[in-house]
């Protein structure tokens, strides 16, 4: 699988699992079959990391200085092993979770060589916290962490040295501890003193590293399969969660619509009953008698009848409007609004401006065609209400998220097949 396809796969997974960038970076590293096993050396500034590396490799590759120089990754390849000198844990521009240090410790490393100077006594809080994280990671990845106590030649009192070792062993009881002196080893090499070389502890540490390196291939296979399994599980669970969310949203959407439609039908039925005394009268409908100039300012029977019709219609509108408000329909959509606020209402949009005659009431509330129109148009404005639009947007977003998760799952399967 080429790098572009791998990156596309990573991007698809990160779009739905944004917190898994570290795990994905490590997985990509493990997918690179030809990469050499990597030993990352971690430790605070001036604890002897670079000097130790030089002795282990057998040549002065890494800079040894009294000032801070390792603020980025320094590496060297030798005998099919890649050595990384990570930024110091207390470097000015690189904290523990700095990008370079994070990459060295969590993405690149197959073996972590944790360096601590015995001159500093026991582990400090930063060192102890990171070691605990590495120990926990070993349970999941089988990557080994080797704790190395350096500069033991600077503690001539063996009793004190033993006390320091014991104290550190109590801090990290799950780790074996290796005590070394790069200075003794260099002096032994330069002066041909075998005893100094043996007492330096470098030989024993090399042997331990050789054993750890022999386990890297199987550890990588285990870790790769574990990461793939974890990602599959997370994606599967996320998809199930999103399906559950979608189901709940759709049920809410359906229930809201059912409640709105049922409530509107009940109100329209009630209005029919309430309007019976108004629309069904014996004799002539006096509301139809037109006004004349002579009766313009008189309270005639025709005006009284029209007033009854208008009051009955207003009461019907109030009942319907109360139902609309209960269900979040409080105004017209923005695209239908005018500059005249008094007519920017759903009632006016559906019914019109005014109803004065009984035939108008009958047409509105007693014909099946008009009733169906009322139900259809009030439902339209219900669906245009803010709450319904937000709910519809959530449903659409959840469905898109499901699609992204499914794409990520397929991409991960393709990556796994290519592994």
Swiss-Prot record:
Xref: InterPro entries: GTP-bd, P-loop_NTPase
UniProt-recorded name of the protein: Uncharacterized protein ACIAD1443
Any GO CC annotation of this UniProt entry: cytoplasm
Single Gene Ontology MF annotation: GTP binding
Cystine connections: none
Pfam families in the cross-refs: MMR_HSR1 (PF01926)
Record keywords, A-Z: Aromatic hydrocarbons catabolism
Organism: Acinetobacter baylyi (strain ATCC 33305 / BD413 / ADP1)
One GO-annotated biological process of the protein: tRNA methylation
Chain segments annotated as transmembrane: none
